[in-house]
Every structure is written in structure tokens, then in C-alpha cells.
Amino acid sequence: MAVEKFETALKKLEDVVKKLEGGELSLEESLKAFEEGVKFSAFCSKKLNEAERRVETLVKQRDGSFVTKPFEEEE
């Protein structure tokens, strides 16, 4: 799979889902589409995880200055 951009992979994943939901594919075509969809889903998940690690939170200090801190997901 030579997809480089998240948006491209997401669009292709959406297209695969539409094909599968359409119900007009043969069993073999459905399996192939499903396998493609799993690959696109894994790629998108990986890209989202990479982006999450890069996100930083801007925090205002008492003196009015700002610093960045790593993003921490609230539980």
C-alpha cells in the first residue's frame, strides 16, 4: 500500500466501507475489499497515534508567559 497521506487513506477507507455496505460485491470481492479496508484502517490509526504524540498543550504560567507541555489525555 503506497498511501502517504492520512486524508487519502481515510477517503479510500470510506470508499471501501461504501462498497461493502452496498452489498453488491461477490464474496471474493468482499474479502479483498475487507482486507484493503483493514490496511487503510491500520494506516490511519498509526498516523493518528503519531499526531497525538506530537500535539502539545499551551499552558499559561502565573507570570503571564506561556510554555508548552506534552498533551496528556484526561482519563
Swiss-Prot record:
The yes or no answer to whether the keyword Transcription regulation is present is: no
Task: State a single Gene Ontology molecular function.
Answer: exodeoxyribonuclease VII activity
Q: Which domain of life is it from?
A: Bacteria
CC terms in the record's Gene Ontology section: cytosol; exodeoxyribonuclease VII complex
GO BP annotation list: DNA catabolic process
| Localization of this protein | Cytoplasm
State the UniProt keywords alphabetically. Answer: Cytoplasm, Exonuclease, Hydrolase, Nuclease
Q: Major place of localization?
A: cytoplasm
Top EC class for this record: hydrolase
The keyword Cytoplasm appears for this protein: yes
E.C. no: 3.1.11.6
What reactions does this protein catalyze?
Exonucleolytic cleavage in either 5'- to 3'- or 3'- to 5'-direction to yield nucleoside 5'-phosphates
Listed under subunit, the entry gives: Heterooligomer composed of large and small subunits.
Which family does the record assign?
Answer: Belongs to the XseB family.
Please give the function described in this protein's UniProt entry: Bidirectionally degrades single-stranded DNA into large acid-insoluble oligonucleotides, which are then degraded further into small acid-soluble oligonucleotides.
Specify the protein name.
Answer: Exodeoxyribonuclease 7 small subunit
The scientific name of the source species is: Citrifermentans bemidjiense (strain ATCC BAA-1014 / DSM 16622 / JCM 12645 / Bem)
The organism's taxonomic lineage, starting at the top: Bacteria, Pseudomonadati, Thermodesulfobacteriota, Desulfuromonadia, Geobacterales
